[in-house]
Structures are given as C-alpha cells and as structure tokens.
Amino acid sequence: MPDQIQIEVVYALPMRQTTLTLKINTGSSVEDAIRESGILARHPEIDLAVNKVGLFGRAVALSTRLERPTRIEIYRPLLADPKEIRRQRAEKAKLQSLK
C-alpha cells in the first residue's frame, strides 16, 4: 500500500471559505487531489482550465506531485487588473488635488 499524506484543499469566496481535509497517496498530482477532494462538486464554478492553483500561496501547475502534507489553494480569477485600478485611483487623486 502506498504511503499517504494528509492535505487540505481550500477555496475561498468573498463571504465564506471551504476547507476539505483528506488523505491521498504520496506522489499524487495537485489535480488528482483536487478531484478526489470533492470540492468541484461543491463549487461547480471552479474550472481547472481557468482557475489557478497554488501551495501555500505559491502558484503551481496541476501536474505538480505532492510528496508531503500541504495546503492546496484554488484561486478565483481577478475581477479587475490591479495596475488599471491603481492608475484610476492616481488619476482620481490628481483631479481632486486640482480642485
């Protein structure tokens, strides 16, 4: 029997977070772990072709192999480009300072 590791799969929405804990075989991929966790059934809006994933805040590929206990995070797409938001904020501040 292959060694198993305990992992968490996490997906956060603005008002709530889902955290699932499970044991998987050492060497399983991030994608295998996500699918096995059942989180895709709970959150059908997750599309692994679109949503990025990471381990403790560091982006990784779905094919990344898991060798030790970890936390898999599924990220939501950004609603706005951070650079564009900063540009708009700076422009607004500039206009207000001219008044």
From Swiss-Prot:
Q: Which family does it belong to?
A: Belongs to the UPF0125 (RnfH) family.
Name of the protein = Protein RnfH
Natural source organism:
Tolumonas auensis (strain DSM 9187 / NBRC 110442 / TA 4)
